[in-house]
Regions:
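Glycine-rich phosphate-binding active-site loops on the catalytic face of alpha/beta enzymes
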Residues: 134, 139-142, 187-196, 228-243, ...
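Short, conserved loop/helix-junction motifs that constitute active-site signature segments
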Residues: 199-203
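Glycine/Thr-rich beta-alpha phosphate-binding loop at enzyme active sites
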Residues: 177-192, 209-257, 262-265, 270-271, ...
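Conserved N-terminal beta1-alpha1 strand-loop-helix module at the mouth
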Residues: 1-181, 204-210, 221-227, 262, ...
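Active-site phosphate/pyrophosphate-handling residues
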Residues: 173, 250, 287
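Generic signal for short, ordered secondary-structure residues
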Residues: 107, 153-154, 234, 257-258, ...
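A general structural signal for short secondary-structure boundary/capping elements
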Residues: 161-164, 213-216, 254-257, 275-277, ...
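Donor nucleotide-activated moiety binding/catalytic core segment of transferases
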Residues: 149-156, 189-197
Length: 311
């Protein structure tokens, strides 16, 4: 197939999917702007792959995600014996997500984790647990090992007598020692874990949550079969510097279709007024930080957000 024909296929993909995945209008709080990306070097010669690689880059997907999508589009084409520009890849087998050994999976979470509060201190964890927030995470930043151990132990104690599930961000050994419900790691922290460390977390019986920011990271997370997967950042956030642009609602919905075998958590810049659109994608949990931490009355804010989760 000639380059012009491959270009025409790429144009067709962009035409059919630009409304959802292209540069989106940003006139309201539910829209993000996605900038076309350079096309990465091709790794295989098939026309479907080449067209999808071009198209997904033009639709704003970074190189690793454009590559992941192009490979999936090629597998979809081979599996169905047709190249369908209208069908965005969403079958797990086309992303290599099938055939995992259930015995190696981390312990299960409820399919819907509900409102998920990400909180900086054990005191705030306890307050939100007592306010009825069903899932809480201690994101305690410190380089002092003793302070970390003390804060994690205090957080575990703070949720006792409540129904809250407590995840500890990053500090996996302290979480194991204190008997937390689970740990949550970012993608870089997951990559930094040695095999023996990951085995120790698995052997402890703790649940594992993993942050992801696109297709390639979701595939990477699936390799360890975590208890849940977080998807974000959905909207712009000032809390931490992100390596990727905000994902937006259309991408979030596509991620949910692909990863529905996992409990899923949407995170990143989500305010109460955006809960209906987020819930409509099918995620079973919405994580918030500022909406609780910066609220003048955190308990009242929690009650409002819990009501929003119920629709």
């Amino acid at each position: 197939m000639q380059a012009a024909e491959i270009q025409a296929l790429a144009d067709a993909i962009v035409h059919h999917h630009s409304a959802a995945f292209g540069a989106q209008l940003h006139h309201d709080a539910n829209s993000v702007e996605l900038v076309p990306q350079p096309v990465p070097p091709a790794l295989r010669p098939e026309p479907a792959y080449l067209a999808a690689l071009q198209a997904c880059s033009r639709l704003g997907f970074i190189a690793v995600d454009a590559e992941c999508l192009a490979q999936a589009w090629q597998r979809q084409t081979e599996r169905t014996n047709q190249f369908d520009v209208t069908h965005w890849p969403d079958a797990p087998q086309d992303f290599g997500l099938s055939g995992a050994d259930p015995a190696l999976a981390f312990p299960a979470c409820p399919p819907a984790l509900g409102l998920y509060g990400v909180l900086p201190t054990a005191e705030s964890v306890g307050r939100m647990a007592r306010a009825g927030v069903p899932t809480v995470q201690l994101r305690f930043k410190s380089d002092d090992a003793a302070a970390i151990r003390a804060e994690v132990q205090a957080a575990v104690k703070a949720v006792q007598g409540t129904q809250a599930r407590l995840f500890i961000n990053d500090h996996w050994q302290a979480a194991i020692d204190a008997g937390a419900y689970g740990i949550h790691v970012g993608q870089e922290d997951l990559d930094a874990l040695e095999g023996a460390q990951l085995d120790a977390i698995h052997a402890s019986g703790l649940r594992l949550g993993v942050s992801t920011h696109g297709y390639a990271e979701m595939v990477r997370a699936h390799a360890v079969q975590p208890s849940y997967i977080a998807l974000g950042a959905v909207f712009p956030t000032t809390l931490k510097r992100m390596a990727t642009a905000p994902q937006g609602l259309a991408r979030l919905q596509a991620y949910v279709r692909l990863m529905q075998q996992y409990p899923l958590v949407a995170i990143g810049g989500i305010a109460a007024e955006q809960f209906p659109q987020i819930r409509a994608t099918g995620v079973g949990s919405i994580a918030v930080v500022r909406a609780l931490v910066n609220a003048p009355d955190p308990e009242a804010a929690a009650a409002h957000l819990l009501a929003c989760m119920q629709g």
